[in-house]
């Protein structure tokens, strides 16, 4: 199982390297001691920075939220250029469309934090003494990162990223039809 996990991290190496960069940046900003910064290692932390446990809510939130948000935003940006051309329009002739499609999948497959970071998030934000309003506000984010961190342990985030890339142009065109109409007029 570890070999499959490492293979998917290598296949999505651009997103893997960028996620380790974001995690390393958060460790540097928050002063979290880092044990191993290698992006590619043959264990369950492949694609993650191995660091000490976070000490407070701010560190934990940043460790889970910043890499997730940055990779998700980049994934959406690249999928707008790649998946829209390939999946929605059906333009199979452009090399940039395929490149953007691959980069979008790579970033989407590497959004979620490690399972240990998610459990740390749960310990800090869902303990008995935590604010109820904060628990409610963070519930959707926690559900997403918890569910996808479990999928990541079994290398299923790659499959989920492909499904997201295929569905993304249709969902986007449904939510923002004006943007799609303008882009079709300009094409």
Language model: regions and residue ranges:
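Short, strongly hydrophobic alpha-helical membrane anchors
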Residues: 182-187
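Small-residue-rich helix-interface/hinge motifs
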Residues: 2-57
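Metalloprotease/metallohydrolase-associated module, dominated by Zn2+-dependent proteases
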Residues: 36-38, 46-180
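Short hydrophobic helices that act as membrane-entry/anchoring signals
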Residues: 1-16, 23, 27, 134-157
């Amino acid at each position: 199982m570890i070999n499959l996990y490492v293979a998917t991290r290598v296949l999505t190496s651009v997103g893997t390297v960028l996620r380790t960069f974001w995690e390393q940046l958060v460790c540097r900003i928050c002063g979290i001691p880092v044990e191993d910064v290698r992006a590619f290692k043959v264990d369950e932390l492949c694609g993650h920075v191995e660091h000490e446990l976070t000490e407070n809510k701010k560190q934990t939130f940043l460790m889970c939220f910043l890499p997730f948000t940055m990779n998700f935003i980049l994934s959406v940006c690249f999928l707008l250029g790649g998946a829209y051309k390939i999946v929605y329009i059906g333009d199979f002739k452009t090399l940039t469309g395929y490149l953007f499609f691959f980069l979008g999948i790579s970033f989407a497959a590497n959004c979620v934090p490690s399972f240990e970071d998610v459990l740390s998030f749960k310990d800090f934000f869902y303990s008995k003494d935590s604010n109820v309003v904060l628990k409610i506000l963070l519930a959707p984010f926690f559900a997403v990162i918890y569910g996808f961190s479990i999928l990541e342990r079994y290398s299923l985030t790659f499959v989920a990223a492909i499904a997201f890339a295929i569905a993304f142009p249709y969902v986007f065109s449904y939510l923002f039809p004006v943007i799609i109409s303008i882009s079709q007029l300009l094409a």
